[in-house]
Amino acid sequence: VYKVIYTDGATGILKIPKGAGKDNLMYEYLAGVKLNQLRHVFPQFIETKHVYYYSDSLGNPPDMNRLHNLTPHNPENGCRTAGHQALLIKEVDGPSLKTKLNDSDFLAHDLAGVLFQIYYTLHMLKHEFTHYDLHSSNILLDNPVGGKPMLFRYTAYDPPIEFVCRYVPKIIDYGRAFVKGIDLSGLESSTCNTPDCEPDGKQCGFTYYHHEFQDVTKANVSQDLRLLVNLPGPWASLSHKVRFGYHVPEKKVRFTTEEHKVGQWPRRIVNVTDALAALTARLPSKKSSYAAIFTINGTPSGDGRRGEYKFVLAQAGGTRRKKRRRTRRV
């Protein structure tokens, strides 16, 4: 990946995968564009900007003048350019979750809030989104207030759930995700059996889309428990309750799991709803000092209500500012 700096000072990340077996960036772009439509409600999704193709090597660092807009945006066109694609997403100026899992202070004070934010989103969108490759390297940690704590208020609960956390987790890499609304009709029967699809149909992404338990054409409410497997230190007791890979062939256990729609919490964690319940019980108590307030109004789509989240700066001491209040998207 490469950092891109625009003439106006804005920044982005250019993803240029290499090697056989890579995911198809056209599909990742299609998934990202759909998820962009949910970012005003669920801030855990990274902003997807553009997908490009190039004819020859881009160089190192890449020459942006060699990139061309990849249109039309469909799987067929994605096949034709599979080995020469680049994806531009918004930059997150923060570490990955993986790099923080050895930090005892993070484990004690922030991990519960980070995981709650992720699994709240996964639970609320359990019929619309499954990541299918959710692990700690695919979570980036953003802080829009310079590393200071923020108060998170989730108003879907009565009374609202409140906790303080220093990070807004951003889910990245949608190349194997199920996202409701993407048209994949004829992907296997037509697109991946055409000469234009080679080598993509065998090496660059589309063949990974239809495993026994991993299918980007449908949701799986258990698949994204992978993130909770083998958590360190004081979180090991929660990981021990996670059932991931149960009744799945050993060689596939690392990547996929059988779906369990009926929850088993508190005895076991078998789906994202169980995970949310377990994480709710681990949230830290509210603190008095925070630099900003996140109000999350996201609710399941079935009830017809989805309010935009709000981000408001706070006064010193953790109270809401009476002046210069502003709401913005992060």
Regions found by a protein language model. Give the residues of each.
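ATP-binding glycine-rich loop module of kinase domains
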Residues: 1-56
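Eukaryotic short linear interaction motifs
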Residues: 11, 21-24, 55-60, 95-98, ...
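Short coil/turn segments at secondary-structure boundaries
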Residues: 15-17, 60-64, 100-104, 182-187, ...
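Conserved structural core of kinase catalytic domains
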Residues: 43-108
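Conserved kinase catalytic-core helix
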Residues: 103-132, 136-137, 142-146
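Catalytic activation segment of kinase domains across protein kinase-like and atypical kinase folds
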Residues: 135-219
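Helical subdomain adjoining the active site within ATP-dependent kinase catalytic cores
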Residues: 186, 197-316
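Arg/Lys-rich, intrinsically disordered low-complexity tails that mediate electrostatic binding
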Residues: 314-330
